[in-house]
């Protein structure tokens, strides 16, 4: 017992510790070919990467310490360097903005689709310049951005999916993380696959994956893979090996179909409240999130409908917006709430 802790007090991390212990015991009964090493990318790390790859059409997967860092690696692998422009949504989670500016690149925020709050493909195409090197499309609140339209309207520009909030979501039947040139998943707290912390980078094709490995991994992993040594500036920031075990254990018992079914049921209940407008088009968007994002009209009563609970929106406004756009986006975000069935 920690010094000073009251006798008989329930440990605040009891449930979390139990889940970690269960995952480690589960892995102890496994039969991996190699010991687990984040340096070599072996054992549980390799198994986790293979599991995420299998769930995403065989796209090569790379386990990384956070989704934000994975976004940075994805941008680097796309060739983004200082001074380049990256098109992104005016309404976005700030980590995407941070990944762009960490490389010295310039975020170019464009208008959101009012039906989804995700990046509007036509606005993105209009913002393209000779300095545009990539598009970062965030699937906000599990609602997929229209990545196929982005690829069609911006030929030759790599499209990176920020699927941190959309593991298991679909657009027109296509799985989030399989539509762009690269995609990032989050294993952070509160995500569908919660490993405590971590991110997964999915790549279209081996060449892009090998560039990501050279950017992010230890020289020994490159040597074993038959790749040349990394540049001297490579950071070799690796995930904790226990995170790989936690992700594998959670993934083994997780069903995207069941999560999407639960989301659809919550959306069906919400659809009966005519004062709410659900984000996304249920004919196109199938979300795996336990919550359903809605827009509230001006003057909507503070109390939620019976049987529903409300959570604040996680969306943020990029600092790069001009002041009038920032004010308009802030007013819009003030009306965004996440509604979820009580007890889910």
Where are these regions (language model features)?
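A structural micro-motif
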Residues: 59, 84, 105, 157-158, ...
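Conserved PLP-anchoring active-site segment centered on the Schiff-base-forming lysine
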Residues: 74-128
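Conserved PLP-binding active-site segment in aminotransferase class I/II-type PLP enzymes
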Residues: 1-77, 81, 250, 327-344
């Amino acid at each position: 017992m920690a010094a000073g802790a009251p006798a008989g007090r329930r440990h605040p991390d009891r449930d979390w510790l139990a889940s970690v212990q269960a995952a480690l015991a589960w892995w102890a009964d496994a039969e991996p070919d190699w010991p687990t090493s984040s340096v070599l990318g072996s054992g549980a790390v390799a198994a986790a990467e293979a599991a995420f790859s299998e769930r995403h059409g065989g796209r090569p997967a790379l386990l990384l310490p956070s989704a934000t860092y994975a976004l940075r690696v994805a941008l680097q692998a796309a060739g983004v360097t200082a001074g380049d422009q990256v098109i992104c949504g005016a309404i976005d989670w700030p980590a995407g903005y941070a990944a762009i500016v960490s490389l010295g690149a310039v975020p170019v925020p464009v208008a959101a689709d009012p039906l989804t709050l995700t990046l509007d493909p036509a606005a993105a195409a209009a913002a393209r310049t000779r300095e545009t090197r990539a598009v970062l499309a965030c699937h906000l609140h599990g609602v997929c951005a229209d990545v196929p339209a982005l690829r069609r309207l911006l030929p030759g520009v790599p499209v990176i999916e920020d699927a941190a909030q959309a593991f298991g979501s679909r657009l027109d039947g296509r799985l989030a993380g399989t539509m762009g040139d690269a995609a990032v998943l989050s294993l952070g707290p509160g995500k569908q696959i919660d490993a405590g912390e971590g991110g997964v980078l999915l790549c279209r094709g081996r060449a892009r994956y090998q560039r990501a490995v050279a950017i992010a991994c230890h020289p020994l992993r490159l040597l074993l893979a038959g790749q040349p040594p990394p540049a001297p500036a490579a950071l070799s920031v690796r995930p904790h090996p226990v995170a790989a075990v936690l992700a594998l254990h959670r993934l083994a018992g997780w069903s995207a179909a069941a999560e999407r079914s639960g989301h659809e049921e919550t959306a069906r209940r919400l659809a009966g409240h005519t004062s709410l407008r659900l984000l996304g088009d249920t004919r196109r968007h199938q979300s795996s999130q336990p919550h359903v994002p809605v827009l509230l009209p001006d003057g909507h009563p503070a109390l939620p409908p019976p049987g529903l609970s409300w959570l604040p929106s996680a969306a943020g406004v990029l600092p790069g917006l001009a002041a009038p756009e920032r004010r308009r986006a802030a007013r819009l975000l003030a009306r965004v709430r996440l509604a979820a069935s009580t007890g889910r």
